[in-house]
Amino acid sequence: MIEIDKYLLELDRATPVQVKGRVKEVIGLVVKAAVPDVWIGELCLVYSSRSKLPVKAEVVGFQGGDVLLMPLGDLQNVGPQSDVVPTGKCLTVKVGPQLLGRVLNGVGEPMDTRLRGPLECHDEYPVYSHPPDPLSRQRVIHPLSIGIRAIDSLLTCGEGQRVGLFAAAGVGKSTLMGMIARNTEADVNVIALIGERGREVLDFIEQDLGEEGLKRTVVVCATSNEPSLVRLKGAYVATAIAESFRDQGKKVVLMMDSVTRFARAQREVGLACGEPPTRGGYTPSVFAELPKLLERSGNSDKGSITAFYTVLVAGDDMNEPVADEVRSILDGHIILSRDLAAQGHYPAIDPLQSVSRVMTTVAGPDHCRAAEQVREVLATYEKQRDLILLGAYQRGTDRKVDFAIDNIDAVQGFLKQGTQEKADFRETLSRVNKLCGASIINARKG
């Protein structure tokens, strides 16, 4: 039986008349070309006499009568008068359950075809889409077990929440992401590795994520050597894949490492197009694109995307422009402390500097009270830490300090967790209850 609809669709996509343009200049990252009737976001093919395969490029702007293109590949063989052919399409990504367990590049093409064969997905999803309508978003009211005691007990997350992981380099961000991917109660994980070192990609997949974690995960990878537009697209491709699963009613966890490198890629694109540098050297488009990307995750009327975005904090400066902007957009932030990491305390989460803005909604009142008592122990001990270590504090002076000294080892032991250990949510609540001597009854809503 002939699938007539399939052929009708192909006819609709066909372009009977081919429109061509020519390259005029290549300056840095930008290709200037004369191409008629194109639009922002349209994909073009740049042909070279020295290469059989064309280079994909995207229309990113216009200057006078010229079209500004940014390549999605290497411009090595492109020269003056190279042909530019518009495709009439924007970038899309293939979606479907066949994506699970696969590793894709920044434009959604499979990187693991040697091991797993070609990608047999027939449905396509637009890389760019609008966030869910504010009135159609479901409220964040159901807790999501992350399987990490420090988060489940003191920074409880909800389905559809967006959380930032803020840390300097080398304090365990990738390890924490691997734990979240393995332990979280989600149907699908989508992980975007943006601007990572090439060596770290396989390390993350095999060591941090593991075979079990990969089975329900889609990995999108755009390493630091890729063109800036590819690194930029990697974030959008991963978000589009997560949206496609959300539209099927799935509970999705999206993780991106890192938003900082996404912002740097957007800065490169903006500067190449002539934007002026502003706050912190970033172009205005960076601060326009961040909310467009981050607002796409969350709940819809069909499913949920719970998102974790890592942010590189240079010199532990939480007020640098990207960190400050991301923190203002998201629903919570988890700070990883270099001091805790230096003490061998992993995960190096600092509960006193971190916050979940939905915890009071998704956690019960008894759970919240117990969490407050644990925080009080940590805060009291930290405030008197120097006096205690010097032996200058005399027991009996302050009951709160005495209580903190008696319980600090138990609290810190509770917050530590092995990388391969998964913490049960109810057991975590029971243990935090015993730490504080409180009673947690029906702490979990749902």
Specify the residue positions occupied by each region the protein language model found.
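N-terminal accessory targeting/assembly segments
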Residues: 1-102, 106-111
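Active-site phosphate-binding and catalytic loops of NTP-dependent enzymes
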Residues: 53-56, 91-95, 110-117, 135-141, ...
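P-loop NTPase nucleotide-binding/switch module
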Residues: 82-84, 91, 98, 111-161, ...
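Flexible glycine-/small-residue-rich
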Residues: 25-27, 35, 48-50, 61, ...
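P-loop NTPase catalytic core
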Residues: 153-154, 160-446
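Glycine-rich, flexible loop/turn motifs
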Residues: 87-91, 107, 123, 131, ...
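A generic structural signal for well-ordered coil/turn residues at beta-strand boundaries
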Residues: 19, 40, 99, 121-123, ...
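Phosphate-interacting basic helix/loop segments used at nucleotide- and nucleic-acid interfaces
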Residues: 3-8, 87, 146-151, 238, ...
